[in-house]
């Protein structure tokens, strides 16, 4: 080996050859600066600076050693950078990884950790406490399964060093792997729970689960509504998979929308299950209930069973009554009457037997003579009237309705036959409000060029039923308001209509037997021929014989009769025998209409009442008018009709 520049011969050369020749000179320390002094140095030696001369690079450029030295420095720098990077990857991790999550966020405050926007996958590690999101263990597992699926793929590439570091901290005892297996099983179980609500026969599974939880079938508590549009006030609702916090809050949230609520809550592997009996403030359909409860409970509508309760089932009422007494139910509001009626002893003993006389009295007071109207209106009183409730519980409703209408007609017919025409007009006027104007009728007669005084005179004889004067004929072209005028008067007087189309029947005149006034509308030439042949006695106002179905011939005095026609019988000599039996008024002008198509002159019951009261002195006399005024001041003094037996208090 050649002598290196700056290297002295002797011991230094041997030392350089022994070390491999990588250093140039071996320095000998004679004296150091600073506060510490080596023990092998002499205190009195003088520092000449000769040891610093050897550190100066005095070699010549171009000797071939620049490139190896630069390469050596570069390789050392790369090795140092790789070592530092490995240490960073080993001991420094992402803020979202489980090893760097703050204990305040993950362990001490799980609810604060639950609202984080970006969350990574938590590695399995030893924990002092189980995580609690505030929504129950089932919902935590479901949420974890949904959030951990993308986390696995996210940490595949860069999570190896983190895993190694955690295994080193865990001591390598395999506990992390066991905990990870448990979380994997929980994720699979949560995925199975979510798949339960996606099956095709979901309703069957819900019904099975309901019976498993509550111990009875859902169909034993409810009655089925096929239509989702049917309205009902009481509903039984069973909701599955509800959040724990929502299940507790629904006890308060449902109170503003209902008057009664019975809530039971059960827990299963599907989550919270809520059974409710709710009475809303107004009737709702199943579609409306499902929509509102779906928003309130934050679950899909298909996860609910909604049907109305069995209100006439004693076991069903007893179930709600007994469960309401336990501590497993939350009850709000007043208990429905159908539960009280079937469970409380006092109400059960107060159930009354059905009384037909009360039904007849109700129909008479409300002036109902139609069977369908009576059946419907009386059934609506089932929740208020005990007799109506007993009527609904009876198996002979059709028979009761028919008998009640028959008796009501008998009472009405006898009451009507007992009254004179003046009393009947007064009786009909009591049912009409005092808001009419008689001038509308007078203006209409003046518009049709009918003199008022002759009309009042004819109307007076007509209402009294004077022979030969009890038939008024209104003649004129079409659209002149003849039928409008006569129908309005007939409606106020409560009369009946007969039609010539039924003249082939023996019973077409039978409506005249139960009325005070009759009307034959739109009589044609054939009708006048029939009247001239068979009904001359009817126009006279004398007693006639009427054939009524399933009864013997009835003899009675024919009531006053009004006839409308387009033919003037006074101009036809064929009907000369009818001229003395009828009074004819001509309506020659078309009935005026306003922009809405309504008649300009209003002919209603209120106006007719005002008309009769105004012209009562000319029609009936001053005595009847004074009697009418006394009734207006003092009220009706006669007792109302009563067909219900009174209660007699008997002494002991």
From Swiss-Prot:
Domain SF3 helicase: 450-600
Binding site for ATP: 476-483
GO MF, any single term: DNA helicase activity
GO cellular component: host cell nucleus
SUPFAM superfamilies: Origin of replication-binding domain, RBD-like, P-loop containing nucleoside triphosphate hydrolases
Main location: host cell
Modification after translation, per record: Phosphorylated. Sumoylated.
Short sequence motif named Nuclear export signal, residue ranges: 108-117
Superkingdom to which the source organism belongs: Viruses
EC number: 5.6.2.4
Chain positions of cross-link Glycyl lysine isopeptide (Lys-Gly) (interchain with G-Cter in SUMO): 557
Biased composition regions of type Acidic residues, renumbered to the chain: 623-635
Top class in the EC scheme: isomerase
Residues that bear Phosphoserine: 94, 98, 109
Motif position, Nuclear localization signal: 88-90
Reactions catalysed: Couples ATP hydrolysis with the unwinding of duplex DNA by translocating in the 3'-5' direction; ATP + H2O = ADP + phosphate + H(+)
GO BP terms: DNA replication
Coiled coil segments of this chain: none
Subcellular location: Host nucleus
Region (DNA-binding region) residue spans: 185-351
Pfam family for this entry, one: PPV_E1_DBD
Recorded family membership: Belongs to the papillomaviridae E1 protein family.
Subunit details: Can form hexamers. Interacts with E2 protein; this interaction increases E1 DNA binding specificity. Interacts with host DNA polymerase subunit POLA2. Interacts with host single stranded DNA-binding protein RPA1. Interacts with host TOP1; this interaction stimulates the enzymatic activity of TOP1.
Name of the protein: Replication protein E1
Species in which this protein is naturally found: Human papillomavirus type 61
